[in-house]
């Protein structure tokens, strides 16, 4: 296929090839080689023990943090899915019920996977190589996010975008085709520290760095015994904690509701057998099942 230079803007290219970008998805690109490398940043967190006992991208930082993974790749397409539009922010639950954090209400990686498969199918027809990374321990998913112009890293350590805030998940697709990198944009949290103020355990006391040893979300996914000082802060949370997300001003584009949040009956959960529990919440990260 003969491609004119102006078509190498990825959005123009997809439009010309009748590939629709789904609702709530934003995309951008970076050139490869990118010379982007976050390996040392990951190692620093690990050396300071702030990763707690998480594996994931900490298992092999030299690879997961490396931007230029493939000599054949000419670009990486970054896909951001805004799941914040699906459910409004709620802040209450009923007595005897357990709250599920907004990021875990559903498997929000599904739309990213579906769109990336569509892109891969297209590039396959051109005999162009691709490699995707979606929620993978082999790739630091936010590696190219800032360089692509989609947003910035907030003081909560989450990736933020204007009007979306932290309510997004990220996928990456390396492609054997050269797309132009957008002009760099300058974003910042400025003097805002709402995420730090809202964190119930002080896991964000050092801005831009999360101490997983204090993070409720980490402990609710850990097979270890939860420390007493964390237990007293968990309250009625069943899975996850998103206080740092709900407090983030760029993500507050909807009214906060006092209605019940997504919740589960804790008594039923306790009496549910393993197979039914996994079936009901198959997208949850469960230690020893997911590795």
Region locations from a protein language model:
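Residue-level signal for pocket-adjacent positions within structured domains
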Residues: 154, 168, 210, 264, ...
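Iron-sulfur cluster-binding cysteine motifs and their immediate structural context
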Residues: 194-217, 223-224, 234-261
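Short alpha-helical interface patches
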Residues: 35-47, 139-143, 147, 212-220, ...
């Amino acid at each position: 296929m003969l491609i004119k230079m102006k078509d190498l803007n990825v959005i123009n290219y997809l439009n010309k090839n009748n590939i629709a970008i789904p609702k709530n998805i934003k995309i951008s690109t970076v050139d490869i080689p990118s010379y982007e490398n976050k390996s040392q940043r990951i190692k620093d967190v690990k050396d300071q023990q702030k990763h707690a006992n998480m594996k994931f991208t900490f298992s092999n930082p030299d690879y997961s943090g490396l931007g230029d993974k493939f000599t054949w790749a000419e670009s990486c397409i970054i896909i951001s899915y805004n799941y914040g539009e699906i459910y409004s922010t709620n802040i209450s639950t009923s007595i005897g019920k357990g709250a599920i954090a907004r990021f875990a209400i559903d498997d929000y990686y599904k739309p990213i996977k579906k769109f990336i498969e569509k892109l891969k199918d297209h590039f396959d027809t051109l005999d162009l190589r691709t490699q995707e990374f979606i929620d993978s321990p082999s790739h630091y998913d936010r590696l190219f996010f800032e360089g692509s112009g989609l947003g910035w890293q907030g003081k909560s350590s989450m990736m933020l975008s204007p009007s979306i805030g932290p309510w997004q998940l990220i996928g990456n697709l390396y492609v054997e085709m050269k797309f132009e990198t957008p002009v760099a944009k300058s974003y910042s949290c400025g003097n805002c520290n709402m995420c730090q103020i809202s964190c119930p355990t002080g896991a964000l006391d050092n801005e831009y760095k999360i101490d997983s040893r204090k993070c409720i979300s980490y402990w609710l996914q850990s097979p270890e015994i939860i420390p007493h000082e964390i237990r007293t802060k968990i309250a009625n949370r069943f899975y996850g904690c998103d206080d740092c997300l709900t407090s983030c001003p760029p993500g507050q584009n909807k009214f906060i509701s006092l209605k019940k949040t997504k919740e589960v009956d804790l008594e039923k959960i306790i009496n549910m057998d393993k197979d039914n529990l996994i079936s009901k919440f198959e997208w949850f990260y469960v230690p020893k099942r997911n590795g």
